């Protein structure tokens, strides 16, 4: 019987640190639900002490997720651990993940401390975390550059203090696979109480070998792998979980371990993370890239036609990628659309059927035929924009030509009021953005604009993703339409709604803080 490798996802904590715009609480919950559906064992969803917004997000996810263990990060600082526990306590069970640097460089230059003092602090903080939960994980930051004898001392002390998972991070992506395996083997040889904890690894991709390091560590005895979907994360990214999961599945003959992941959900989860985080997946990305199962060489094509196993070590279907595309038309009823969504793996709670069917009919009238990729794009936008909107695009028109200055006229619902404005710009998109910004009075700077076709052919849906800077904060917006200018307008309206909602959340947090202060004064 093979042993289980625990899959620890840190997309919402370490992965989010790489994003140009922070995710909203709703977007984080959307990703958390996708990860739960995929079957991750543990999800690290934030760093609660970092901001009131992160605290609220962690609390919301902890209250909602039932089938994965929710975890929050805390430094070896009393307040960090106490705040993490406060955010997580709404969950039936939770994990606190605390960490401190252990390498000579970090101890000397960052902490300005000694190894003995680091061990003392680690022990105290692990014990403090154990006051809140028996599921405590301890990480030795920069373990890859920590002498193994020093590392063994820290690990033994942390286990004695009550840590049930010990994480060995290659924080800067420095070690080679054979080195990293040697570190894990060295700990098993040196730490007498190592059988009382699960050894975990957390690798970074600075040298392009994060997945290789994680797999080498598993082969050496590690039984938890930490990473992020699509490998997102700081600098060159984290270990790509989908790659580790499928490597373990495909090479079970030599790995002799398994995961409890529903691998048929990998494709959908990957797409969800990519779209919400506004991080496109490279075509040649292993497992989930659009070219991962493509064969262009004539020799390869011939071999695949004769037997797929000639050139495919796994199938698209094994990760939930259905390559058989069915089409629907405006004559297709609600039942047909609902049935197709179910066949693609969607549940009723994943989308609003009324809104989706309305958008489907409008698209079918324009395109004639609506394909699976169209439905998935509509469902994604439907989910992104289902919250109450303060701003709504009512009407727009654009006049533009090769030698004319572009002029846009826009009508926008701002709360209960309909406003109209016209503006010139350097092209139709800029003209529309000038008009919208005049209407709302928001001072935003466009820092990123991406256009991607969702589907094939000249009538494909165009998805526009934008990132804007507003008073030092970055916000993401998305729009979808067969018309690129309309997609662009919708993306700007979406981003302005996100800014408005963020301001409302900030007001609510301030109100709660003021009420708490008033209650203290009353007592």
Swiss-Prot record:
Superkingdom: Bacteria
Reaction it catalyzes: 3-methyl-2-oxobutanoate + acetyl-CoA + H2O = (2S)-2-isopropylmalate + CoA + H(+)
GO biological process: L-leucine biosynthetic process
GO molecular function list: 2-isopropylmalate synthase activity; acetyl-CoA C-acetyltransferase activity; manganese ion binding
Domain Pyruvate carboxyltransferase residue range list: 5-267
GO CC terms of this entry: cytosol
Region span, Regulatory domain: 392-523
UniProt cross-references to CDD domains, sorted A to Z: DRE_TIM_IPMS
Quaternary assembly: Homodimer.
Family, similarity comment: Belongs to the alpha-IPM synthase/homocitrate synthase family. LeuA type 1 subfamily.
Name the record gives this protein: 2-isopropylmalate synthase
Organism: Salmonella agona (strain SL483)
Organism lineage: Bacteria, Pseudomonadati, Pseudomonadota, Gammaproteobacteria, Enterobacterales
